[in-house]
A protein has these predicted regions:
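Sec-dependent bacterial lipoprotein signal peptides
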Residues: 1-21
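Short, compositionally biased low-complexity segments
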Residues: 21-28, 66-74, 133-141, 448-461
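Membrane-proximal, proline-rich intrinsically disordered regions
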Residues: 23-75, 82, 87-92, 100, ...
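Structured, solvent-exposed acidic/aromatic patches
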Residues: 40, 69-120, 124-440, 478-480
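Short coil/turn segments at secondary-structure boundaries
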Residues: 61-65, 290-291, 497-506
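C-terminal functional modules
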Residues: 409, 416-420, 435-575
């Protein structure tokens, strides 16, 4: 597995880099021996650049999950020109690390560092273009140049994509060259050229998949990339960012683990996500979510009634869900009290519930072992509020799945079913993708909470996979099959917001549908959102005061009307 750890060494380097960066870091002509180039400064920059790529993954991970209906972060689409000022500024601050590496390797003496920086830049900038569209690129990062440019032009999103695709190819060329001195402080690829070449090919594949409908040669180039191979295909090759249980001198636990410290309440998780995983007997359920309560809120108690989720959506009292539950588990008559208490632990909200926030933090379901490194929570584990539970604040060694083997299998399935010319057996790929993602989830749980977590019985996984392949087989057309696959990707996307948001914008799938067992769609918002589905992020108002070239983008581009160049679907929800 390709992993990266934000270790103590990386954190300690941050202050040093801020000092070194103020010097003329790129002047490597101080070397007197051309056969022994000075790579120390590059070794300091590399972990920062890798963390910057992590930041490109997490920048709007939560909101993208909300756009997709996985939890409540920005799921009402009430966005404005002040919503993402920090995201915009962070993009250019993070990418500066990669720019410094590229400047420092222009002399050709450190090709592997250069290739790595190119890969990280292509991945990161690709994510930001998927968020905002047109952005400063060719004239960016020149504020401190000999001839400063503090008002860079905005490049077209399609032009940036072309440059990033070429950047991946250039990275592969650089990585094939001999590196005189070993690469140091590489927490993602251990300085291995083969590993980084594989990541470069995978990033290129992702860029080609996203942009295929917006480029004249999109399908042909995507097919060529799949035919060429060399991208991530096995779990051992997964590109993953790992956290640890370290809390001193700097906390290095997974960001979602903050709930376990008792200092922050979790987002409301989608009732549909949790409820359908219950009904579908999804083996990932106890790894995804931790239950804090078994108490069913008393509707005769004003306080409990005020904490009850809006509009009859509360699962233990939701008749439509309980009817589905009885069918799924073969229950005749009343549902046992123990079952209702178990269901009560999956306390969240329906999509686009904009009602006020109650004092319900100790009731909310919270992220479990995957990806947060939290606590496993099956029926045998007693639910307990995290407030004041120091005994549960022991983990946090979670992960972010940057790009995994199951992602690339889903990429291939989409390409096959959507008629791009890419070949393969989509059903076999679907089965493999499900099994590989489940295995990652289980492994994380066994690592983070070994005393509680249990490996699912093989027959349970087999039954689950068969149920979804049966849905796939029953779908009459390739587009219907792609929708089934997209709904499974939705379940897989717990912790991976950008990929599911991109999928919805590329394909329009999963479709809008009801909340029930083995539904192949996403439920409609429970209340009408103030805006439509987010096709992109709004440009930050603050940028207009800094760069006059931004003004027209701030005023003329509407986030729920104007798509990214590759989005030909323009997803809209029926309210």
């Amino acid at each position: 597995m390709i992993t990266t750890k934000n270790s103590i060494r990386t954190l300690a380097l941050a202050g040093l880099i801020s000092i070194v960066s103020s010097c003329n870091l790129t002047e490597l002509d101080i070397n007197t021996d051309p056969n022994r180039p000075a790579s120390g400064s590059l070794g300091l920059l590399l972990p920062l650049a890798e963390n910057a790529a992590r930041n490109a993954f997490t920048a709007i991970n939560s909101d993208a999950m909300g756009f997709a209906g996985l939890w409540t972060s920005s799921d009402s689409y009430n966005l404005s020109n002040t919503s993402y000022q920090g995201t915009w500024n962070g993009a250019y601050q993070n990418l500066q690390n990669m720019e410094e590496m590229l400047k420092a390797t222009e002399d050709g003496k450190n090709p592997r560092y250069r290739g790595i920086a190119m890969v990280l830049k292509a991945y990161s900038m690709g994510n930001y273009v998927d968020m905002f569209g047109d952005m400063p690129y060719t004239e960016a990062w020149k504020g401190n140049a000999a001839t400063p440019n503090t008002s860079p032009k905005f490049d077209k999103d399609s032009d940036i994509y072309e440059a990033l695709i070429k950047l991946c190819d250039q990275a592969i060329v650089e990585l094939a060259k001999a590196q005189p001195i070993a690469v140091i402080n590489d927490y993602m690829g251990a300085g291995n050229a083969t590993t980084w070449t594989r990541i470069a090919r995978t990033v290129k594949l992702r860029l080609l998949l996203n942009s295929r409908k917006g480029r004249a040669t999109g399908n042909a180039e995507l097919k060529a990339a799949f035919d060429a191979g060399g991208f991530i295909t096995t779990p051992a090759q997964n590109w993953t960012y790992l956290y640890s249980t370290q809390i001193s001198p700097e906390r290095n636990t997974h960001p979602w683990f903050i709930t376990y410290t008792g200092t922050s309440d979790p987002n409301y998780i989608s009732h549909q996500l949790m409820g359908e995983m219950i009904l579908n007997k999804d083996p990932r359920l106890p790894f995804y979510f931790y239950r804090q309560t078994t108490r069913i809120l008393d509707q005769n108690n004003p306080t409990d009634r005020g904490s009850t989720p809006f509009g009859g959506s509360y699962l233990p009292l939701r008749d439509s869900f309980l009817d589905e539950y009885k069918k799924a588990f073969g229950i005749t008559g009343a549902i046992p009290a123990a079952d209702l208490g178990y269901i009560a632990g999956f306390f969240g909200r329906d999509r686009a519930d904009v009602s006020g926030v109650a004092a319900d933090g100790p009731l909310r379901a919270t992220p479990g072992t995957y990806p947060a490194g939290g606590v496993f929570s099956d029926r045998s584990v007693a639910a307990a509020s995290l407030t004041g539970q120091a005994a549960l604040n022991f983990g946090g060694d979670g992960q972010w799945p940057l790009i995994h083997s199951w992602n690339t299998k889903y990429y291939q399935i989409e390409a096959i079913l959507d008629g791009t010319g890419v070949t393969g057996d989509p059903k076999a790929l679907f089965i493999a993708a499900m099994r590989e993602q489940i295995a990652v989830v289980v492994a994380q749980g066994l690592k983070s909470d070994p005393s509680r977590a249990k490996t699912p019985v093989a027959a349970e996984i087999d039954a689950y996979v068969k149920a979804w392949t049966d849905l796939y087989d029953a779908a009459a057309t390739n587009q219907a099959k792609l929708n089934v696959v997209a709904k499974q990707i939705w379940f897989c996307s717990w912790g991976q917001g950008m990929d599911i948001w991109n999928l919805q914008r590329r394909t329009g799938y999963p479709i809008q549908s009801q909340f029930k067992q083995f539904s192949v769609g996403i439920q409609a918002p429970i209340s009408k959102p103030p805006r439509q589905y987010a096709l992109r992020l709004p440009y930050p108002q603050s940028e207009g005061a800094l760069n006059p070239n931004a003004s027209k983008f701030i005023t003329d581009v509407i986030f729920d009307r104007d798509p990214i160049f590759w989005d030909k679907v323009k997803t809209k929800w029926e309210f």
